[in-house]
């Protein structure tokens, strides 16, 4: 009947619409749905669409005051996951009007806000989002992007080199600045505050900023290269975060840093706007991501968090190494690395990309490879990530037997050797070790590094794997 009829009704009657043709303004989502036993996949998919858009558990008379057909999310396709029992990919289309312009916060609150605790589902994972051009255009995106960053730094044709200062907690500001200076002096482009360095009793932020700025300017003067240190502006309040970013700008340093998941998307977007307006680069760390993205059947895949960061704004983001100590399977990692860097990315299920994404010239983000990597990984990293990346060696620089500066020299020599060989047409995948060995002949620092790390590998199976 057309009239209002109270009572509970099945979601799929309203929200499962296999005949629906998606619009180019729709936000499309791919969910991995694991229904409770006895719940049909269509009902589970429809429930996800309903609970993340206009639905509630019962019919309400106020539904008659609006056009549900115009505003409801629709589950338009369901496919079983190969090799998994009782797992399905449910595709949901959301009308653009459901979302506030320029707000990643609102987008996530809508799409993943409530539905993950839903009783009819055993587990739920957001695998991918297609952001329509009309929504992309409401975001500023990265403060500067890859090309502008290269122009600011005057560094071309190679990956950039970084190093996280260790021990991450406990150094005084003066000693911390000294470690920064030695790394930059030795040949690195950047050094980095660890993600949990904010403003603690043993080192307050203002002291750290001051000594790091001194290290930057001294090493710049001595090397003739532009240097940077990611000054972590993450703080307990947005106001305090902005205060730190403003102080960094007053010191004249090139780059600040933010933990975008723990700090939150609202704070991150504010900081990104400030950075563009004031010429600061913005380095993004993904602390807390594994709590959200590590389980294969529940949570949010990192490729979605990466897309969200490109919208919210950041010039660098940590994105796994493929070869080090932290998670990252090659094809999947390269899938979201391309989503960060490229302007147009075709749907490619072999790399976990569920939708074609057009960024309409939104600036790109440099992926940062960091975590358990050292000189022997350099050929693989250069091969996998290409020029537009930041390779970050923490222990792989500071663990050098002769100290930080020689550790930095070793990494820079290894990188230059790999880039030179690649440009000469050599195959880094097969000749990588040979290229590094040749370079050790004219770099005692590299030879010493090769000796220390020759045996270390972190061999565990990746958790994040593709479906068969």
UniProtKB/Swiss-Prot annotation:
The disulfide bond which can form in the large chain dimeric partners within the hexadecamer appears to be associated with oxidative stress and protein turnover. HAMAP family: RuBisCO_L_type1. Binds 1 Mg(2+) ion per subunit. One of its GO terms (cellular component) is chloroplast. Keywords: Calvin cycle, Carbon dioxide fixation, Chloroplast, Disulfide bond, Lyase, Magnesium, Metal-binding, Methylation, Monooxygenase, Oxidoreductase, Photorespiration, Photosynthesis, Plastid. GO terms for molecular function: magnesium ion binding; monooxygenase activity; ribulose-bisphosphate carboxylase activity. It holds the Pfam family RuBisCO_large. One of its GO terms (biological process) is photorespiration. This is Ribulose bisphosphate carboxylase large chain. RuBisCO catalyzes two reactions: the carboxylation of D-ribulose 1,5-bisphosphate, the primary event in carbon dioxide fixation, as well as the oxidative fragmentation of the pentose substrate in the photorespiration process. Both reactions occur simultaneously and in competition at the same active site. It is found in: Plastid, Chloroplast. The basic functional RuBisCO is composed of a large chain homodimer in a 'head-to-tail' conformation. In form I RuBisCO this homodimer is arranged in a barrel-like tetramer with the small subunits forming a tetrameric 'cap' on each end of the 'barrel'. The modification N6-carboxylysine is found at residue 192.
């Amino acid at each position: 009947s057309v009239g209002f009829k109270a009572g509970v009704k099945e979601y799929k009657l309203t929200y499962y619409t296999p005949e629906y043709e998606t619009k180019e303004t729709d936000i499309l989502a791919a969910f991995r749905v694991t229904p409770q036993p006895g719940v049909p996949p269509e009902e589970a998919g429809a429930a996800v669409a309903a609970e993340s858009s206009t639905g509630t558990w019962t019919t309400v008379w106020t539904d008659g005051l609006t056009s549900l057909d115009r505003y409801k999310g629709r589950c338009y396709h369901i496919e079983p996951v190969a090799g998994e029992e009782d797992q399905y990919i449910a595709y949901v289309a959301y009308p653009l009007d459901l979302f506030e312009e320029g707000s990643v916060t609102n987008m996530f609150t809508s799409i993943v806000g409530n539905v993950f605790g839903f009783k009819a589902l055993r587990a739920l994972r957001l695998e991918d989002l297609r952001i329509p051009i009309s929504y992309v255009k409401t975001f500023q995106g990265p403060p500067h992007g890859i090309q502008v960053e290269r122009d600011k730094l005057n560094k071309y044709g190679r990956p950039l080199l970084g190093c996280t200062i260790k021990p991450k907690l406990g150094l005084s500001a003066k000693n911390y600045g000294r470690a920064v200076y030695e790394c930059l002096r030795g040949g690195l482009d950047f050094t980095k505050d660890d993600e949990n360095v904010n403003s603690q009793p043993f080192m307050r932020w203002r002291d750290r900023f001051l000594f790091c700025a001194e290290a930057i300017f001294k090493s710049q003067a001595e090397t003739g290269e532009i240097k940077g240190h990611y000054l972590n502006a993450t703080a307990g309040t947005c106001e305090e975060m902005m205060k730190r970013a403003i102080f960094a700008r007053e010191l004249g340093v090139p780059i600040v840093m933010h933990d975008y998941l723990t700090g939150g998307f609202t704070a991150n977007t504010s900081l990104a706007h400030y950075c563009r307006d004031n010429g600061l680069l913005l380095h993004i760390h993904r602390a807390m991501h594994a709590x959200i993205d590590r389980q294969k059947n529940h949570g949010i895949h990192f490729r979605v968090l990466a897309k969200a960061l490109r919208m919210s704004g950041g010039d660098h983001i940590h994105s796994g190494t493929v070869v080090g100590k932290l998670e990252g399977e090659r094809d999947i990692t390269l899938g979201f690395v391309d989503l960060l860097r490229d302007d147009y990315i075709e749907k490619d299920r072999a790399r976990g990309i569920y939708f074609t994404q057009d960024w309409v010239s939104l600036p790109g983000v440099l992926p940062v490879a960091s975590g358990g990597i050292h000189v022997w990984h350099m050929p693989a990293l250069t091969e996998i990530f290409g020029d537009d990346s930041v390779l970050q060696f923490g222990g792989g620089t500071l663990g050098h037997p002769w100290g930080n500066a020689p550790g930095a020299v070793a990494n820079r020599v290894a990188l230059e050797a790999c880039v030179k060989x690649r440009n000469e047409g050599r195959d880094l995948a097969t000749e990588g070790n040979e290229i590094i060995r040749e370079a050790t002949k004219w770099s005692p620092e590299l030879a010493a590094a090769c000796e220390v790390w020759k045996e270390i590998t972190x061999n565990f199976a990746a958790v994040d794997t593709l479906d068969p």
